[in-house]
Amino acid sequence: DVAECFYGRPDAPRIVSGRYGLASKDTTPAQIISVFDNLALPEPKDKFTVGIVDDVTFLSLPPVEEIALSGESTFEAKFYGLGADGTVGANKNSVKIIGDNTKKYCQAYFAYDSKKSGGFTCSHLRFGDEPIRSTYLVNTPNFVACHVQAYLHMYDVTRGLRDGGTFLLNTIWEGEELAKNLPAKVKKYFADHNITVYYINATKIAQEIGLGNRTNTILQSAFFRITEVIPVDLAVEQMKKFIVKSYGKKGQDVVDKNYAAVDRGGEYRQLPVDKAWSELTVVEEHDTTDPKFIREVVRPINAQAGDDLKVSAFLGREDGTWDQGTAAYEKRGVAAFVPEWNFENCIQCNKCAYVCPHAAIRPFVLTEKELECAPVAADATLPAIGKTFAGMRFIQSVDVLDCLGCGNCVDVCPGKKGVKALEMKPLETQLDKQPIWDYCVKEVTSKQDLVDTKLNVKNSQFAT
């Protein structure tokens, strides 16, 4: 319509057209800057696109680094959480607390993946003394909270964090152990951008209080105490009011536990950032054994970097065709604690495998030949119970990288003489057990033909 208005006029200005928001992508300030940079050229590109990297038709404009347009009075924060850990709910309450008790303007947006419970969540919050007109996600936060330590290796959680910003990590590591386990990329970013780093073991605190895996209130309290976006006393008072409103019907015991979570949110510590981290070399690790589609498309998408994929990555898939079974390659390793099998206390009831909602623990029966090649010692297995399993060995194997740490298997395990055969241990201590699972899944043959899989719970778990 604009071009038509000026058609044929001698004084018509130069008119170029472009498209934005392709594939439902955000339109950010950096993309608008690239548009103006294009207009400033002697020969601006016409019919351009922004927000994508088009290496097929070459219509996209060169990307520009994201900038922070919000004023000093606006505070931006991102929270990375695990579906059903309470992070999103806590952040919604935080917005209500700030919006209802101060004159600040608030904005919040919450992103989820398709897994819902146990999946990836990201909360985008803005608070300011002036109206917030940012119609895009938080790309340059002042504060980032990572509520799952495994995310340090899975996602670029420091991306866009401003110079002099603040980072909060929920982790079971402390002090020197934490510094040792942080990825080089993260440590380098901390040093290069003068980031203030705090950490807290909210998982341990929640278990001590009796809240199980619900770390949200502890981390919400830590957020208010660290940022002081509103007075701490006011934040604590309002958090406790929300606790009564949310959990009052569940009894005073539940209320008291959440009160304790608020109070213990102050048990965070600061991690000294070594300036020498700036000299670290970042090496990107890639599994070259995966299929090309997994390496070049699925893994970037799973790493929340799908918007960075080039158009050429989808050549031949214009109709939306997608390979099946891609979830088998994820191996997220997001559980802080996973079960460790103690064969000495196992009665081979298979109840643990029966109750596992993610099939992350399974019984395997190995022949003598299969056992010889297995990455497990024979004396760490049991003689399989059952006449049809004569001469074979039994093992209860855990897929530690797919486990979500719910603890159902430990709860249901009868064990022997009151001692369970399963015990929750830190994920890092069990990573050497993953090859056992991988071997059993790929190399151990199914034994379902040797038993009636419909007879009882135990036999049902040998079905494949």
PLM features per residue range, with description:
Residues 1-29, 41:
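C-terminal non-catalytic interaction/assembly regions of soluble proteins
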Residues 235-239, 248-402, 410-464:
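Ferredoxin-type iron-sulfur electron-transfer modules and their immediate structural context
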Residues 59-79, 456-463:
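Short, Gly/Pro- and small/polar-rich lid/capping loops
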Residues 25-64, 257-275, 279:
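Structural signature of the thiamine diphosphate
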Residues 12-21, 47-53, 107-113:
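A generic structural motif
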Residues 1-4, 9, 71-83, 87-303, ...:
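Active-site cofactor/cluster-binding pocket
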Residues 20-23, 55, 82-85, 130-132, ...:
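Short, glycine-/Ser/Thr-/acidic-enriched flexible segments
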